[in-house]
A protein has these predicted regions:
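Active-site hotspot residues in diverse enzymes, especially metal/ion-binding acidic/histidine motifs
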Residues: 1-293
Length: 293
């Protein structure tokens, strides 16, 4: 689908303001996700704000979706996110960031902050831009592009399609996001035109299939083995333990429990030997590093 417009930088600055004002997120980044780039850590971040259902559905274009305000324990509303793990890992990463934007209502913050009209298309564009800002922050991205750009530019300052695709693949590897995210980021930050972005995405005169084949070949040539690989993960946090409780207390029909275990490849819990409950000495080393200094 042809990209017809890109949100202005004022939207990006509003998104950055939201991120900087999100105290809970900043504390989580500092404690659990200290790396400058989130990459796959965004999946762990998403887990902290909702229940994530990881399950593969092959031959399905939908990368994932968000269900809000589902009645949970005690009747409290709860968020669920589905991630299609038959998609490649880099697509799962971007999907997780996108759905996190929905949970945080980033679009509503930006609309109010900038006084923009609330439309479905604009909201989705804002959420996609949020995912880009979260995973591909401007400062780091510019430094990354500038550090390798001379390797790919012609002497006249122009760049061939093949070299631009090489640059895209290198950036995909650094930020662990899909090709489309990098191409759009290059356009959002004015490295390339929207017309050229559509060219690379196969939305104009360039053959989309041939571009995708070339990108896959470059990924293999560069040794980026984590790309273009689906995880096929089947997991819901705490599902196994909850099934054990439901089975022990006869809360759910046994055939339903067996069916869920089969679908999620969950083995029956082993019978633990009594010595597994023995206690061992474990000495906390909190503050030990500071004391050494």
């Amino acid at each position: 689908m042809t990209i017809t417009s890109i949100l202005p930088m004022s939207v990006e600055k509003s998104i950055e303001k939201f991120i900087n004002q999100n105290v809970e997120y900043q504390k989580l980044r500092e404690k659990f996700f200290p790396n400058a780039l989130l990459r796959e850590d965004v999946l762990g971040l998403l887990d902290r704000f909702c229940t994530v259902v990881y399950f593969p559905i092959e031959n399905e274009d939908n990368n994932g979706f968000h269900i809000t305000d589902v009645p949970f324990a005690g009747g409290t509303p709860h968020n669920f996110v589905y991630i299609n793990t038959a998609q490649t890992m880099e697509k799962q990463v971007f999907t997780a960031a996108h759905e996190l934007g929905h949970i945080w209502n980033v679009d509503q913050f930006v609309l109010k902050d900038l006084g923009l009209e609330n439309t479905t298309e604009r909201c989705e564009m804002i959420i996609n831009r949020f995912a880009a800002v979260l995973l591909i922050p401007e400062g780091i991205f510019r430094n990354s592009v500038d550090s390798v750009l001379d390797d790919y530019l012609n002497p006249d300052g122009r760049i061939t399609v093949i070299n631009l695709l090489k640059l895209v693949v290198v950036l995909m590897n650094q930020f662990f996001v899909p090709m489309k995210a990098i191409v759009l980021r290059l356009a959002e930050l004015n490295y390339i035109s929207l017309e050229n972005a559509n060219d690379l995405l196969g939305n104009s005169h360039l053959d989309k299939v041939k571009i995708e084949e070339l990108v896959q070949s470059l990924i293999a040539d560069f040794g980026y083995v984590k790309f273009q690989v689906p995880s096929m993960k089947k997991w819901i946090d705490g599902l196994s333990e909850k099934l054990d409780i439901a089975e022990a207390q006869h809360l759910v029909p046994q055939e339903k429990i067996d069916h869920i275990r089969k679908e999620f490849d969950l083995a029956r819990p082993p019978v633990l030997a009594t010595e597994m409950t023995d206690t061992l000495q474990f000495t906390s080393q909190e503050g030990a590093k500071d004391n050494d200094n």
